Amino acid sequence: QEAGCLGTAVTKEIWRERLTHLKKLGCNAIRAAHHTYSEEFLDLCDEMGFYVYEECFDKWKGGLYGRYFDKNWESDVEAMVKRDRNRACIVIWGVGNEVENQGQDSMLAILKQLSDKVRSLDSSRPITYAMNPHFKRESNVDLSKIKDIQQFVDEVSDTEIYDAKERVSRIAKIAEIVDIISCNYQEQWYELIHEQIPNKLILGTEVYEYFCGHYDQMQNFTEQIPSAIPFEYDYCIGSFIWTGYDYLGESMGYPAKGWSGALIRTNNEYRPVAYMLKSIWSEEPVVHFSVMDYSLDDEGVKEHWDSPIYADHWHFPQFRKTLIPYMIASNCDEVHLFLNGKQFFIPRPSECKNGIITGFLPWQPGTVTVVGYQNGKEACRHEVVTPGMAVALAFDQECDHKECVSTVNLGIPEKKQHLLLTVRAVDENGNSCFRESGKVHFAVEGAAKIVGVDNGDICSNEPYQENSVHLYHGCASVMLELYCKPGRVSVHAF
């Protein structure tokens, strides 16, 4: 619902840009969590061909909406369904997320009430409810006195149901009311759920980006990418990663000012895990090399929502001789790996867990090249180079590794709009300098103004509404507002 330095005042072109990045990764569906989204956003989903799971609530009588639920639930459901039932993108209606008293009689009564209302307005689409992995036995807790309903729902208590079969018996009661069994973080029980409830499809309404739980422990660090699971089970129709983009709020504590366990940073920079998902989702040939680098700062991610600390560089000035762990994400038949022209033999992606090749390379400055092959022919490649000293700043929009410039000239739009530009520290050959962290200043000439800066670091305490910001992982971005006036707009980074 927000876009980094813009806050919640997000314009249509910024949503288009973000959806385009997700589409490039192979994403084809959006869960609009957990409220009704703007018409402009859904217009784009119609236009760009995204499936949308739309839901009207998070919690019901608990949480912030609780004071309005009894009075407003019916009008809010009507407003959502009547507004959007003729849209091409809407494929599923959601009526709640991780609510209180899940699977208990009081909850089931409200679930039926909501589901019946939606069906009376639109009988053409399935209805579902996103289940928390926690199920609890009945208690006499007064929910109106719970200050943090999400914490109450999430935390383990003495009423927690640990037995998987007893948990599935609660799920079966929910399944009698909804059309699709929607599970948050419950991939480890899909087989058991399907065995007990074979006539309903399963949807992963929230999944971790890298880890899975264990049958005997809800939260575990099992290395199994949840988004690959729908390709294994024909009764599982998909999964929604929490989340596609970092967002403000729901911080795990200072200095983080938001959620950082996403595929893409607030300034559109991809994390390496994004390429893992692209290798699963996309039919386009993918090969991408990253290193594991524990010298990088902790980004304050909530543990199970995190992924191993990979980074896109080949630069370890602190080492003379050491072995560097790496990861190669690819959907190709085979991958060839070279370090300074010397080949190292590695397994095929199909022979590796999650299709992700891992191993070690000896540190030496130079170039790492990975080449993906399909049907015996080169289909894609990725190179990372040890950079020299940073000598310039280069805008992504102007840098083709032949000419890198710290000024970019823009055309005039037909109407006022926002535009995000990213600049990188580069060496004399145009190679990105990942470890550079100096401060970059932005200036603009012409019919435009700077509305914010963003380096993608959710733990930075630098304000967004400035003209300068430190580089993070060698880059920083500036958000412009362009006016529909004659003339040239020039943007400078220095």
What is each stretch, according to the model?
Residues E334-K342, S437-G452:
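Extended low-complexity, serine/threonine- and proline-enriched intrinsically disordered segments
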Residues K23, V91-W93, Q113-S120, I127-S144, ...:
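Substrate-binding clefts and catalytic carboxylate motifs of secreted carbohydrate-active enzymes
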Residues P413-L421, G487:
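Short, solvent-exposed loop/turn segments enriched in Ser/Thr/Gly
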Residues P347-P349, V391-F395, H441-S460:
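Short aromatic-acidic-glycine turn motif
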Residues Q1-K117, S123, I127-T128:
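Active-site-adjacent substrate/metal-binding segments within catalytic domains
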Residues C484-S490:
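Short glycine/proline/serine/threonine-rich loop/turn segments at secondary-structure transition edges
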Residues I357-W363, Y464-C484:
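Short, hydrophobic beta-strand segments
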